[in-house]
Amino acid sequence: MKNKGKAMRNMLLGMLGAAVCMAAMWLSFAYGKDNDRNGLIMSNWPKMPMIRFELSIIFVAFGVPLYYLGAKEMVKAIRLSRRRKSINDLRMARLFDMCMHLSVIGLVFIQGVLVAIAIVYKLLFGTKLMGADIIYVVESLFYYFAIPVFAYLVFSLAGTSISFMYFIINERVKVSKICLLFNPLVMFGLGELLKLTKIYYLVDFAAAMIPFGFLLMLAAGMVHVAKMPVARRRRRTE
């Protein structure tokens, strides 16, 4: 692999970006103790200071470009690791490429939509509108975005995770088999299980499981890149 050192530095920056996105999600989706959920509505939204939502958007705007640096190096590493004559490898590499780029767009899009819904609810809560009217407005707003949000979530999580696991199982990515768990789909599922505990600090921790999954995947990819041979330049013969 050419520029191996640069690739590893970019992947490290990508991990930093994913960590910043985790902080953004904790700021906006860690609702704290005694939060009750009513459909899409969180009872603690009005209690949360507006600065948390504002910082959340700023963190995502800063973290996603850093994450993209790692994501594009991850795509390159997967492309170089596939077998040239394998159709399945080619398809999975293309799936990984597409879904990693979707994850970059999706982190901004999904975070922006969900934070906007929380802000709208918080602002309407301070008006004279009835509670039922507020819920109707907020849920109607969400359903306008539901299809693209759901599509980005499914493709960015499932596509990257399944294709990444494929390359580990078939030993194209040279990492331990435990890294099969290091992907956003598995972390998302683990987060949903944590939410079932109803223990508020576990529920709050689960808010950042998706970027945590991407962080772990980049870490596994970085280990793989470290094991890849350095491409040597061919000497020109006179």
Predicted feature residues:
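Hydrophobic, aromatic-enriched alpha-helical segments typical of multi-pass transmembrane helices
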Residues: 2-233
